[in-house]
Amino acid sequence: MAQEDMFNMDAWNRLYDRMRSGAEYADTPMPQSLFDSWPITVDGEVNSPYTALLPDLVKEAEAAGVTVTKVSKEVCNWNGTGAGSVSNVEITGIPVSWLIERAGGYADNADINGVRVMRADGSSKRAMPLDKVDGGEAFLVYKINGEQLTAANGFPCTNWCEGVDPEVNSKQMNEYKVVTDAPDFDDHVYEFEHHDGNPNGWIDADGNWTNKPNATVLGVPEGLVIQNGQPYTFHGYVDAYDEKIASVEFSMDFGKTWTKHDLGDTDVNKLVWFDFTWTPQEESAYCLQLRATTESGLVSPQIQTVMVNAKDAMPAADETVVIDTPSLVAPKTAAAEVAEGKE
């Protein structure tokens, strides 16, 4: 997946969000001087707090052979059933555990329970679990797909914590603070309501999951016309944030029967993509439904339904309507505006 195809939340009205959005929309690259002068601080409950420039840390980490390049997922906490706020990309970064070791390691304090990621504009200070940091699943990322980050993806750097929702993946972060006040990472309701940690899914008013696990078909507009008698492939993904996907199921009869596919040992740090190929046998409308299960037994709380129309004769180009505006309401013409003004 290319960087420009990654989802991002630059609709937030934060200082650096506005700068990133403006640069992205104007196709203006971020200045290299921002990377060259970007400070990273590691402090809090460590033995030797320090501040170092990002390029110096990169050079030192690369020389030490500790940088990591790997494929990793990012799935928005808000990502609903049928939505596409997901990314699967190659990241290159410095393990946060190495950055802490560079600070002399953790201080002798039994109450240490997390690492806060401090965003440079002060708008976020979410905490990561120690097991993610110590387990080599938290990174200071400075490249995606072998290239420096785009403006929308947080140039010059972003935090990246694997196997959790990306609300802790603060863009343009400048400080890792080892703390004793991190939340209970098993209390997803508290994390959700207090904007801390990793809720790992969206919850309703009763604290129930609404999008975990999530089984989604992508790129099929409602009522898509397909050729009868010819195979058609539905493409999509299944994910459950911090839980492994165990199976995915498909139904063509509105849930009366399900065809189950066991997935074996999946990687919680990567998206599970699928292709479901099916051949209609007669001209008609058809609906596909899908759901997923996790290792712990969670079942998709919401089920996506996509409808296609199988036709023996596909419509010609002049028999179709092409909507060339993203708006649901057609834009006014100059003549229409003049006519309205005369009323």
Predicted regions and their residues:
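Stable alpha-helical elements in mature extracytoplasmic
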Residues: 50-60, 92-95, 99, 169
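Acidic/histidine-rich, surface-exposed loop or edge segments in extracytoplasmic proteins
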Residues: 38, 67-82
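Extended, aromatic/histidine-rich regions of cofactor-dependent oxidoreductases associated
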Residues: 1-41, 46-52, 101-343
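Catalytic-loop motifs flanking and including active-site residues across diverse enzymes
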Residues: 72, 92-95, 155
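Extended catalytic/binding region for NAD+/ADP-ribose chemistry, centered on the ART fold
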Residues: 86-93, 159
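Second-shell loop/turn segments in exported
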Residues: 43, 77-89
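Surface-exposed, glycine/proline- and aromatic-rich loop segments on solvent-exposed faces
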Residues: 41-43, 50-72
